[in-house]
Amino acid sequence: REVVREAIMLDRSETGVRLRCRSRTPFPDKVRLRAPRLGLDIMARTVWQTGFDTGLAFEM
């Protein structure tokens, strides 16, 4: 089952991203990150969550 969450990408590097969501609902361990305008469609793992912010590491 796919769940879609909108978020603001606060920071991006070669290895991952920092996102800010509207809710504090925990992310699953693994997610598919899609941002078509940025050319991103990649699997990532949740590394940390604090409040509304989440850090994801790209699966290389």
List each language-model region with its residue ranges:
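Structured alpha-helical
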Residues: 1-60
